[in-house]
């Protein structure tokens, strides 16, 4: 039994190093941005949606995460829908919302 203790002590620094590596890697992964933030959110935009169903609209400009302008509408029932920014109906909805926000 006395011979087993020195073998365990010999591996203690290696186990400590391994533990520190695992903890350091998991902290870095927890602080990293989510993969969904690094790509386009709107893969299949909708060309038409009745404006009465829209509660709010968020516009995301092109950037390193996505090369296209994205229009994300939150509907009154809580769902989200991507709108085609080139569609005439979507442009009218955005203009109305901009006019409404300037009035307040």
Curated annotation (Swiss-Prot):
It comes from Cavia porcellus (Guinea pig). Disulfide bonds join 40-66, 42-82. It is found in: Secreted. Has chemotactic activity for neutrophils. Belongs to the intercrine alpha (chemokine CxC) family. GO terms for cellular component: extracellular space. One of its GO terms (biological process) is immune response. One of its GO terms (molecular function) is chemokine activity. Keywords: Cytokine, Disulfide bond, Growth factor, Inflammatory response, Secreted, Signal. It comes from the Eukaryota. InterPro entries: Chemokine_b/g/d (IPR039809), Chemokine_CXC (IPR001089), Chemokine_CXC_CS (IPR018048), Chemokine_IL8-like_dom (IPR001811), CXC_Chemokine_domain (IPR033899), Interleukin_8-like_sf (IPR036048). Residues 1-31 form the signal peptide. This is Growth-regulated alpha protein. CDD domains: Chemokine_CXC (cd00273).
